[in-house]
Amino acid sequence: MMRLPWFEHRAPGSVQEAARILAGEGADAMLIAGGTDLLPNMKRRQMAPKILVSLRNIAELKKNGSVLGAGTTLTEIVRKTELPLGLRQAAHQVATVHLRNMGTLGGILCLDSRCNY
């Protein structure tokens, strides 16, 4: 099994703090929420950020209601009965339960998959 390369982990508590970290660290830093795409790419050495800036502790990205923040997981989308049925069904079709529990809307929208073959 390939191991992750070394990286520093930062967990800001606000969008403003995350933005300050990104501005200060530049290209050495990347955002991470669920990590379902980023971490496998790091294991394959397709990406090698020196700093991962976690979005998990930023409450404003997980607001209640029909607003879907970048940190909303696919499982949360499936369970939001106020959302259109088609959107909930589409979220339910993505990957496995484990990946739906981890994968975030922001990560899916910013997905940077590459063919490894």
Describe the residue ranges of each PLM region.
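C-terminal structural segment of proteins
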Residues: M1-Y117
